[in-house]
Amino acid sequence: MRDSSSPARPSLTQLPAWQALKSHFETMRDRHLRDLFAADPRRGERLVAEGAGVYLDYSKNRITDETLRLLLQLAREAGVEARRDAMFAGERINLTENRAVLHSALRAPRGAAVTVDGTNVVQEVQEVLDRMSAFADRVRAGTWLGATGKPIRNIVNIGIGGSDLGPVMAYEALKFYADRRLTLRFVSNVDGTDLVEKTRDLDPAETLFIVSSKTFTTLETMANAQSARAWLLAGLENVPDENAAIARPIISRHFVAVSTNAAEVERFGIDTANMFGFWDWVGGRYSVDSAIGLSLMIAIGPNGFRDFLAGFHAMDEHFRSAPLEQNLPVLLGVLGVWYRNFFGAQTYAVLPYDQYLAYFPTYLQQLDMESNGKHVTLDGQPVDYDTGPVVWGQPGTNGQHAFYQLIHQGTTLIPCDFLGFCQTLNPLPTPGGPSHHDLLMANMFAQTEALAFGKSLEQVQAEGVAADLAPHRVFEGNRPTNTLLLDRLTPRTLGTLIALYEHKVFVQGAIWNINSFDQWGVELGKVLASKIVPELEAPGEPELKHDSSTNALIRRYRARRR
């Protein structure tokens, strides 16, 4: 399903660079990082790149200069640069939904111009940001009052997918900068436990709900929103939820919406003056820097939020202008293709050495897997190569005592990104010993060194280890890693990191010739669930027409749920 004005692209596997990489891989398959570093004492100084405040050391990858040359040639032959320029120009590169892809416009500075269908969307974005700022300032100042006259002290964001993962990740990452007088909670799961536990200790009179749903019809989000409305009304005035005349002015003080569906927002009882919109050219997983980030703006303030946007924009500009050889998203993207398509790596770990980034791997999981988990090309043809990997991770050093064993000595190749900061936000000395941050970063540097170089049998034997134990103490090494170093975790650097990975995912999707901006795989389960709900709720035994397994599961659930 391609733009009829563009010629069909040759199959990825037929591109000259791909064919050259296949041959080159045979010479690289067994080359060890020990040998690559021994042959080039300056390798760790040469194979680095820097942009927008991010320092990338990619020297511990199983590549040579020739590998990198061929990978960048593949990016060029696959049209990465042209597709990048088309995205920034507002062309409708999301072909299956006939939409532009312009999350970059969300962080364009005031006065910039990005036109979609004759409209400068940057001006619209700035207008929404100004409204968000005014609202956030009132909540933070205590002048936005609930229905009983109390100031708001609790903010509960209700959303799912991109309407939840982005805000909760960013809030946790920037909690150091948050107004601690405010309590922020995030509800996403339709499991009632999520809402019950998140509201259990809150005073309804001081609680504001942000309902984030573009259509205001998302099943899980609206179920949670309706239950939250009932909780609020019961806790304030014991007003029946259906008594709209009494309930509406109460709801309007305790609910705001991030949506584009004014009719549904008003039907719910929210004043549309308190509705903050966004656009169909913003995908959910790319929306944390839109009105979806309202909870974050309330937490860190409008100035902090604009710093957050400035970080995104800095990486956007780097991605647009840096030569491919020094372009951070391109380098990360092509290295990922190298391991996914030539080494057959099925998974990829993101390992932030900062506790504030605990939710960052989960956020990237959606960003990457929902974007590039595709099995057909833009033309609708089945791919004959692997696409998106499984993305996962945990903050260091926790992961070292959980799954690093498999990365070091298991039989599965798992490329890793290590993320660290030179300065900590919470300096904490260890009495009589090194600081906590030095301990943390020493572990990060040690892990990348150990993964790269391992420990040979000869080294183990030289330590006097018993012969029967020696094989167990061998580390093969040759496990590839990237290390990303930044000075300090701030709203700006977080925005930069998010944009870096957004564009890395874009680069890989462009090379694989897939649409990174739809998510049809999410839809089928939702459709089937909507058919099963009435069967679960039916007073009598429903006629079930599913497969035998699903029918049996439904019957067992109905029989045992009470």
From Swiss-Prot:
GO biological processes: gluconeogenesis; glucose 6-phosphate metabolic process; glycolytic process
Q: What is its EC number?
A: 5.3.1.9
Q: Does the keyword Cell inner membrane apply?
A: no
Note the superkingdom of the native organism. Bacteria
Keywords attached to this entry: Cytoplasm, Gluconeogenesis, Glycolysis, Isomerase
Q: Where in the cell is it found?
A: Cytoplasm
One GO CC term on file: cytosol
State the reactions this protein catalyses.
alpha-D-glucose 6-phosphate = beta-D-fructose 6-phosphate
**One MF term in GO for this entry?**
glucose-6-phosphate isomerase activity
Cited function? Catalyzes the reversible isomerization of glucose-6-phosphate to fructose-6-phosphate.
Q: Which family does it belong to?
A: Belongs to the GPI family.
Concerning HAMAP family, the annotation shows: G6P_isomerase
Entry protein name: Glucose-6-phosphate isomerase
This chain's source organism reads Deinococcus geothermalis (strain DSM 11300 / CIP 105573 / AG-3a)
